[in-house]
Regions:
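Major-groove DNA-recognition helix of helix-turn-helix-type DNA-binding domains
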Residues: 34
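Conserved beta-strand-loop-alpha-helix junction that forms the acyl-donor binding cleft
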Residues: 20-22
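Conserved active-site tyrosine of GNAT-family acetyltransferases
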Residues: 26-31, 98, 123-126
Length: 137
């Protein structure tokens, strides 16, 4: 539908910036479990990486000794907050893929009153990602 939210999105993009315990193991988790790819790590020892899948980019930065990881659910555990909402073409297919790879599904797939079909996963650092498709397309 031409009037849907997804169709009206400008051609801009955004990349969530996640502070993680271990950049290398997190990048490998995103590759092996969530189907993302990466080309390189920055610095030695590695302290930064960008993972990509179908145009989605997530930045991973090494937790400094004085820093604190803070997934949104840590700030508001009752709020059901996501750290990222990722628009996809087929939620059912991706949900099946993730389940076959042992990804932790924190909310199973369902149709939402806001016109999307989506589900939530939790990554190896506790970040919550929601993957959803626009039902009006």
């Amino acid at each position: 539908m031409a009037d849907s939210l997804v169709s009206r999105r400008p051609r801009w993009s955004i990349a969530p910036y996640f502070i993680v315990d271990d950049v290398v193991s997190t990048a490998n988790y995103y590759r092996d479990h969530l189907g993302f790819q990466y080309e390189r790590f920055w610095n030695e020892p590695p302290s930064f990486c960008m993972v990509r899948r179908n145009g989605v980019v997530i930045m991973l930065a090494q937790l400094e000794r004085t820093g604190v990881m803070r997934p949104n659910r840590t700030v508001d555990p009752e709020g059901g907050a996501w750290d990222a909402y990722i628009w996809i073409d087929n939620a059912d297919t991706l949900n099946t893929e993730f389940k076959s790879k042992g990804v932790k599904i924190t909310r199973d797939i369902c149709d939402q009153p806001y016109g999307c079909r989506d589900f939530d996963v939790e990554d190896c650092n506790g970040y919550r990602l929601c993957f959803g498709q626009d039902l009006e397309e």
